[in-house]
Amino acid sequence: MTDATTISPLDQARILSEALPHMQEYDDETIVIKYGGHAMGDEDTAKAFARDIVLLEQTAINPVVVHGGGPQIATMLKRLGIVSEFAAGLRITDAATIEIVEMVLAGSINKQLVGYINEAGGKAVGLCGKDGNMVRAVKATRTMVDPDSHIEKVVDLGFVGEPDKVDLTLLNQLIGYELIPVLAPLATSKEGQTFNVNADTFAGAVAGALKAKRLLLLTDVPGVLDKSKKLIPEISIKDARKLIADGTISGGMIPKVETCIYALEQGVQGVVILDGKVPHAVLLELFTNQGTGTLIHK
């Protein structure tokens, strides 16, 4: 994107004027933004993201941020000499690992992002799904085919959960006081056990419960790509399911798109998968005619 210092004052005014209809469209609407990918590890990118979140709040939008932390968790586990195993794209989380995961997600990452947003002039509050019993989870299960026996087996993922219930009491209070919730994807079972939850899945559950206007999933890829590796700007749920069935959508993109479909079916009006490494990706998506990434809708 062109640096603002190289744009004439007239062009800057024109850009702001063209953004006005989009600002009006999202006035007093809730936008859930899942911030993840390797862009989180870059301080300048993280601070730019924080400024964009503050801008949303200043334009009468209600932003709710959910963050991931896979690379940072991996770095900490490696530093401590703990080897991670993965199954079906999810980290197998034992008792020792869940303590580290909670420390990294709810501690260092969450508070750092809260600090960046507050430094930019916002009023962010750092929480996780455990706070106020916001997100209840059940133990996640996955099956995999054994390569030797070719028999499908259930994989024990340990303390990995999937959202089962979202209580909006605390979130609605924060939004009502014009505070910016920043959520780490941790939840508890009804028995009080802490679970690590995939950040996309967590964001989808929160967005669905809030009936958000938009759910934005910031990732390391431009969006959903066709078989020629070109960006698909917009697809319906029906089209998305066809692309999964024919193999166009594959690998790690499948659970992301399934999260999008779930959120839409729960009442979210539109979900966008976009590249978090693109400067001001959130603003480009919400405040420009062309947007960015892939919009999935009903």
Swiss-Prot record:
In what pathway does it function?
Amino-acid biosynthesis; L-arginine biosynthesis; N(2)-acetyl-L-ornithine from L-glutamate: step 2/4
Which intervals of the chain form a coiled coil? none
Query: This chain belongs to which protein, by name?
Result: Acetylglutamate kinase
What PANTHER family does this protein map onto?
A: N-ACETYLGLUTAMATE SYNTHASE (PTHR23342), N-ACETYLGLUTAMATE SYNTHASE, MITOCHONDRIAL (PTHR23342:SF0)
What reaction(s) does this enzyme catalyze? N-acetyl-L-glutamate + ATP = N-acetyl-L-glutamyl 5-phosphate + ADP
What is the name of the gene encoding this protein? argB
Give GO BP annotations, semicolon-separated. arginine biosynthetic process via ornithine; L-arginine biosynthetic process
InterPro entries with a match to the protein in the record: AceGlu_kinase-like_sf, AcgluKinase_fam, ArgB, Asp/Glu/Uridylate_kinase, NAGK-C
Q: Which Gene Ontology terms cover its molecular function?
A: acetylglutamate kinase activity; ATP binding
Q: What class of enzyme is it?
A: transferase
Q: What is its EC number?
A: 2.7.2.8
Localization in the cell = Cytoplasm
One Pfam match, given by its short name, reads: AA_kinase
Which Gene3D superfamilies did the record assign?
Answer: Acetylglutamate kinase-like
Organism in which the protein naturally occurs: Bradyrhizobium sp. (strain ORS 278)
One GO cellular component term of this record is: cytoplasm
Query: Belongs to which family?
Result: Belongs to the acetylglutamate kinase family. ArgB subfamily.
Residues the UniProt record annotates as site (Transition state stabilizer): K34, K256
Kindly list the positions annotated as binding substrate. Answer: G69, G70, R91, N196
Which of UniProt's keywords are assigned here? Answer: Amino-acid biosynthesis, Arginine biosynthesis, ATP-binding, Cytoplasm, Kinase, Nucleotide-binding, Transferase
- Has the keyword Ribonucleoprotein been applied to this entry? no
Annotated function? Catalyzes the ATP-dependent phosphorylation of N-acetyl-L-glutamate.
